[in-house]
């Protein structure tokens, strides 16, 4: 169970870095990073790759939580493309969350 949930935003010389959802589970040594997309079209795999790149390039996360596993989540109002579904099947650290999963 996450002990901290929030978002991450940094404005630096490279521009803005924003991660919509960040949750930390100290007991299981996991960090969850999520991207929210509430558009009229299904979300495609580049959204996941961009999120992963943001997390990989965010030194603060790695410094604050060394050795923690990172899980990724993509939230979508309109579902996912086949390419995104295939990407998730190949990656057990990627969760796809659609509108039906939300309370």
Q: Where do the model's predicted regions map?
A:
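A cross-kingdom feature that marks ATP-driven nucleic-acid transaction machinery
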Residues: 1-103
């Amino acid at each position: 169970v996450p002990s901290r949930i929030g978002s991450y935003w940094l404005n630096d010389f490279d521009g803005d870095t924003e991660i919509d959802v960040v949750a930390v589970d100290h007991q299981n040594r996991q960090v969850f990073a999520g991207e929210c997309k509430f558009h009229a079209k299904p979300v495609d795999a580049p959204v996941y790759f961009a999120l992963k790149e943001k997390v990989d390039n965010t030194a603060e996360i790695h410094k604050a939580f060394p050795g923690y596993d990172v899980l990724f989540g993509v939230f979508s109002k309109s579902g996912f493309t086949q390419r995104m579904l295939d990407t998730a099947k190949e990656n057990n650290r990627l969760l796809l969350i659609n509108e039906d999963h939300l309370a």
